[in-house]
UniProtKB/Swiss-Prot annotation:
Entry's Gene Ontology molecular function annotations: lyase activity
Family matches, as SUPFAM superfamilies: PSTPO5379-like
Transmembrane segment boundaries: none
Species, as recorded: Cupriavidus necator (strain ATCC 17699 / DSM 428 / KCTC 22496 / NCIMB 10442 / H16 / Stanier 337)
Catalytic activity, EC: 4.2.1.-
NCBIfam families cross-referenced by the UniProt entry: PRK05463.1
Protein name: Putative hydro-lyase H16_B1759
Length: 270
């Protein structure tokens, strides 16, 4: 009886993920935090083939910020993480980068794969994946509660360079009640493939963040009395590398607008 209930829950979650992707394919644009709870979400970056090795090495050298979940070969658009999905259309919002600068945001990236048929795509673990376990433990995830995007910040922590790529770590922030910080660290730490435990707790100035009310990406969130800002490595870090390194061309997800997979978050729980 219990097994059948769990299977029904799993099927419902997969169906929710597929429905979300279909909605994005049809043109819906929204941040994905809280969508299809229990399913793994992923950051995305696609680069021309001659930059792929640099990025793979960059990710290998910086696994906290860039944990690779899948690599889609040059010219392909499908991933083993989501049956029938198309990486060009099934993310709600994409960013297009030219010579290290943000050129535009689009809801359908299909023409970009026509323009650059040799794109190699990397799917990177996302901390949205462990937000459901945080909520199940009674820890409010503020940006979900308030219906906003997660705040993200560039930091003074430099990633280890690789080939032509270099840049700083980007972090996401969630305010956590002081008495629950240890729980948040423990819960997220069981998900190392999606950034794992925090990289910093407390004073944002230690990361070079001057003002929490002015995130570099996403939306500012309220911090209540008795709460402490907790910072996790973020999969927007590759976008910082694109900017710092002047990559000629790249396509990424827009911050907070993830690729929702068919993989349960429990798959990455250790």
């Amino acid at each position: 009886m219990q097994d059948s209930a769990l299977e029904r829950t799993r099927i419902a979650a997969v169906n929710a993920a597929r429905a979300a992707r279909a909605s994005y394919r049809a043109g819906t644009v929204q941040p994905t935090a809280g969508i299809a709870p229990g399913m793994t979400q992923a950051n995305m970056i696609a680069l021309p083939r001659d930059w792929a090795w640099d990025f793979l090495l960059y990710a290998q050298r910086n696994p906290k910020a860039c944990p690779v979940l899948d690599v889609i070969e040059a010219g392909a658009q499908q991933t083993v993480l989501a049956q029938g999905a198309d990486i060009r259309t099934d993310i709600p919002l994409y960013r297009v980068w030219r010579d290290g600068k943000l050129a535009e945001e689009v809801a359908d990236a299909t023409p970009l794969w026509t323009e650059h048929p040799d794109l190699v795509t990397f799917l990177i673990g996302c901390s949205f994946t462990f937000e459901t376990p945080l909520q199940e433990a009674g820890i409010e995830v503020r940006h979900i509660a308030d219906g906003s995007n997660v705040p993200m910040y560039r930091t003074n922590r430099q990633c280890r360079p690789a080939g032509r790529l270099h840049g700083e770590m980007v972090v996401s922030m969630r305010p956590i009640p002081a008495h629950r910080v240890a729980d948040a660290v423990s819960i997220s730490g069981r998900f190392p493939s999606v950034h794992g435990s925090p990289v910093h707790v407390g004073d944002p100035a230690a990361l070079g963040i001057a003002d929490l009310a002015r995130p570099d990406f996403g939306d500012a969130v309220r911090i209540e009395p008795g709460e402490i800002p907790v910072f996790w490595a973020c999969g927007v870090t590759p976008q910082a590398a694109v900017m710092a390194s002047g990559v000629p061309f790249a396509v990424t997800h827009a911050p907070g607008h993830m690729f929702i997979t068919d993989v349960p978050d429990s798959t990455y729980h250790v």
